[in-house]
Amino acid sequence: FVLNYLNTTTIAFISLISLLFFLFRFSKVSHTKEPPIISGSWPLLGHLPLMRNTQTPHKTLGALVDKYGPIFTIKLGATNALVLSNWELAKECFTKNDIVVSSRPKPVAVELMSYNQAFIGWAPYGAYWRQLRKIVTLEILSNRRIELLSHIRVSEVQTSIKELVNVWSNQISSQYGLLDDTKSSSTNDEPSTTDYVSVELKKWFAQLTLNMVLRMVVGKRCFGDVDVENKEEAKRFLENIRDFMRLIGTFTVGDGVPFLKWLDLGGHEKEMKKCAKKFDVMLNEWLEEHREKKGLGSEDKVVGERDFMDAMLLVLKDKPIEGFDVDTIIKATTLELILGGSDTTAGTLTWAMCLLLKHPHVLEKLKEELNTYIGKERCVNESDINKLVYLHAIIKETLRLYPPAPFSSPREFTEDCTIGGYHIKKGTRLMPNLWKIHRDPSVWPDPLEFKPERFLSTHKDVDVRGQNFELLPFGSGRRMCAGMSLGLHMVHYILANFLHSFEILNPSPESIDVTEVLEFVTTKATPLEVLVKPCLSFKCYESM
């Protein structure tokens, strides 16, 4: 929910209209047991004003569990939404009733910005979704293709690390003169902040993950000193991603009160159309480039050299799917892969670093694991990742505390059913509060504490892949995140290499700010400034 546009004037205007209709509203007497509905609903607006709370919506609704229990209903304008806050109810939804909750609603943002639900993640449950999901999982995001593109992930991580080492080297050289191996950061001297260089990690992770995803998807990179085609275009592209993620989570007045949609209160529909158009122009250019390359014989490329757009062109072969033409399908899928693969991955990496900086003993223990298995003379390889059990525990604990989408992606009941003994009507939206489920004290002792060790002992068999309903950062059932495997590959590999390559300090005596902002995903509200210094042999960096 992004509801800041609901300013006092807007609320007053809608409230005035609602009074004119209030006397004409009739409620039918229900003879079935329905979940409790929270108090404070406004005419027409429902509980939308409640979402303007200073807290994020998942925290606001999580605080209501003590009063209303783990299952209750809220009204989003004219639409009912079912909020679930424990794992048993989530399991009931995503197993026995999964097919009933496998469709998606169609808010204004999705209609205007996802090529009218051509995104696989936003498509309604049906033939189009099934066919495209099969293509994406078998041809685009299969483990085989992820493995074939490992050289891109390695190249991007090593390039980004080397560029950061060069920044450090240039700064130190300007301060102390030319470096030699005697001034290597691998010495055991006590650290001095003058030996470190400042880096804004939130931005660094965003640029690295975007480069990595763009190369895998369309064969391009936007940031850095190597093979960057147009830096101004890259800057605009990143800004447009930020706009998209903000707007796609916007619940407009038209969503809650459909007959007021034409007013476009707040101007969000206009902004959405503008953002979508910018992406469409760029995607058309990339698609045309790939078609030209295909005509020049790029179809004969070695499989590992094909990017995702190449693969889509080969698989679809100009055959439309359920009314969507091939160009629309490729553009929609390409954009979705870029957005989902870069933004959520960078966000998880940022939260992981926040937690590690707030808990230096955990950071030190992870560094020890890296030094034990990898040493100081080489970089981390993807083949090393499975051995790094403490790293895996840290990522799981990060995803527990900061699930990328705290309400998962919205679902919609396609028929009446029963959840938790309550009758749920067709058309109700489903909002599993993952943030609350992940902090259930009956499942997670000390639920607010960052304790990766729990995944090495009491919760060692709990995974994030949708089968353990107490931990669902990627959702579960038919509609769980299709890009989960790729995202996890990227998170583990990037974090391991970054922490193995640098010593990290908090530049401020103040604790790390972990204020959240919920757009479509939960992100850190402020930059993450850290100090870094290379800690490997310089021969290791030179070999990158």
Curated annotation (Swiss-Prot):
InterPro entries: Cyt_P450 (IPR001128), Cyt_P450_CS (IPR017972), Cyt_P450_E_grp-I (IPR002401), Cyt_P450_sf (IPR036396), Plant_Cytochrome_P450_Monoox (IPR050651)
Any one GO cellular component localisation term in the record: membrane
UniProt: heme binding residues: C481
Cofactor(s) the protein needs: heme
EC category: oxidoreductase
Pfam families documented for this protein: p450
Enzyme Commission number(s) of this protein: 1.14.-.-
Stated induction or repression of this protein's expression: By wounding.
UniProt keywords, alphabetically: Heme, Iron, Membrane, Metal-binding, Monooxygenase, Oxidoreductase
GO molecular function: heme binding; iron ion binding; monooxygenase activity; oxidoreductase activity, acting on paired donors, with incorporation or reduction of molecular oxygen
Annotated localization: Membrane
Family recorded in the similarity comment: Belongs to the cytochrome P450 family.
Protein name per UniProt: Cytochrome P450 82A1
Species, as recorded: Pisum sativum (Garden pea)
Higher taxonomy: Eukaryota, Viridiplantae, Streptophyta, Embryophyta, Tracheophyta
